[in-house]
Amino acid sequence: MNSYHGFRDTTSLFIKGYHATGVMRLHQDHGSTADFPSREDVNNEADFLQYHFTNLCATATGACSKPCEDPGRANSTRPPFPQNQDFYRPVHPNRPQVPSFQSCREQGLSRKGFSPSSDTFRTFSSAHCELGPVNNTQTEVRTYDGPVRHSAVEDDNTGHGALNTLNETLHSGKTFEWMRVRRNQSRAAKIQLGKCSDRELKTNHGRDSDEDTSSGGSRTNFTTKQLTELEKEFHFNKYLTRARRIEIANPLQLSETQVKIWFQNRRMKQKKMLREGLAQGLMLISGCDEDSKKSDTCSSPD
């Protein structure tokens, strides 16, 4: 094999992508040696070398400028995974796929509850990145410059507004319905209207009298029958239990509180009478002593 044919085979191997060391080993394995070409061979092969060298450079440049991509997905625009369909968008076949920042921002804002009003588009060149240029492509990055308000903040502001309104209403001195105290009608008004029976009059009058007595009003007027029964019970029992008070109050058409208050007043009256009786007895004793002394001093001697 002459030098021309050997150089042609070597050039074809270089074009196919073999390394120079691999080409030399391939020639050694086949037992072929590369002879030094003569001057005539060099003159004849100058044009051939220039032609193949130009083709080799063009092929290498095209291979370097072509992006590395999967042969099975060379012309495919579908996302690598079904769950990332919103993250990718179809681009030019010669450009690498770039994540869609618009879909990412919309998903993030929708999850957090933001409601953007206006968007500003800014285009940044990848040549200014620290990682270096990437095929001089441009990536669109959508940023949000509008006012950001969360729904929870709005709810919180609404709650504070309602609380402030309630405080203003309370401090203004307005009287609500639940603040008004409803009292029973007086006995005279019920008699004039004639809307209740005698029993209801006595019961309600007893309750009203309790309220009036506790607040310093008029006292209850008991009937003769009620006073007789109460005096009879007081003669045997000065202190009553709650069950006994209820038992006495029902037939007398009185309340338990009325019976309790009557017994308290009756005990105080008895103590007062005892104190007055003791004082009168002491006064009588002291008067007798004085009379006896006067009689002794005024008596004439015999």
UniProtKB/Swiss-Prot annotation:
Compositional bias segments (type: Polar residues): 214-224
Family matches, as SMART domains: HOX (SM00389)
This protein's GO CC annotations: nucleus
SUPFAM superfamilies with a match to the protein in the record: Homeodomain-like (SSF46689)
Binding region for DNA: 215-274
Pfam families referenced in this protein's UniProt entry, alphabetically: Homeodomain
Region listing for Disordered, in residue ranges: 198-224
Subcellular location: Nucleus
Superkingdom in the source lineage: Eukaryota
Intrachain S-S bonds: none
CDD domains given in the database record: homeodomain (cd00086)
InterPro entries attached to this UniProt entry: HD (IPR001356), HD_metazoa (IPR020479), Homeobox_CS (IPR017970), Homeodomain-like_sf (IPR009057), HXA1/B1/D1 (IPR046327)
Keywords for the protein's UniProt record, in alphabetical order: Developmental protein, DNA-binding, Homeobox, Nucleus, Transcription, Transcription regulation
Gene Ontology molecular-function annotations: DNA-binding transcription factor activity, RNA polymerase II-specific; RNA polymerase II cis-regulatory region sequence-specific DNA binding
Comp. bias regions, Basic and acidic residues: 198-208
Any single biological process term in GO: regulation of transcription by RNA polymerase II
Cited function: Sequence-specific transcription factor which is part of a developmental regulatory system that provides cells with specific positional identities on the anterior-posterior axis.
Descriptive protein name: Homeobox protein Hox-C1a
Biological source species: Danio rerio
Gene behind this protein: hoxc1a
